[in-house]
């Protein structure tokens, strides 16, 4: 163990800055934090919620739906207790669901699965991950206001590697348990304008693990609450071929409260330290541009989104979805 620590702190090239040596040492001590596992897991849970809300709120009572999602997230300097992180994440997944009307309530269930990778080039680090999750959701209307609620669980299974002297090859699982509610009301002002407000609770829990060099990282957890506040503008028109086509645009501000940092305790060679990693923004701005085409019982849609967060986050996403109502 001593020789491993010495190798991490020794610059055999004579070209590394003290900051780079510290960055590589931190990556060896806590590869999950260095590769943004907590952020990636939370984003996958949000991805499932977005899919559920898109289909719970589209006005049909009974149906089956499927959504294909792909996207890229960049974190350019998200803060930690030591060196800031620059991360690139690509993720691609599939969500499927179904819903049915029971009196004046629509009940639904959905499942998602996918894979992706996160890279931290500064330490030759990579997280090759798979993810999956499920959601139960419901929708009703009270005095013209649509009320939607969902309960979900998602898991991220990460294979973590870090190159160089760190030479890490390990794995871990991160779980996200979440519940959310949203209220919205549509006003016809020549176009349909739908203001909405919600509250989404996320509890993130990472399993403890030990690296191939005997570094032990303990379990860690945190809870945050997001408050998405925004509106969607939508206009439907009929084509000569009988399709109803509806372009849309939505914009939301999402303030976040709670434990936006995770404290991760590490033990190695008889010593103990705690690493701090920010995994969520204080505030995000989310936007989405989409179009749907409906004919008879079938709906097909395409949407593209862009998010910005105060922790130097930027994310682009594309969703293709289809639904058959009966």
Where in the sequence are the language-model features?
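Membrane translocator/pore-forming domains, dominated by Gram-negative outer-membrane beta-barrels
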Residues: 1, 10, 58-326
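Interface/linker segment at the passenger-translocator junction
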Residues: 1-79
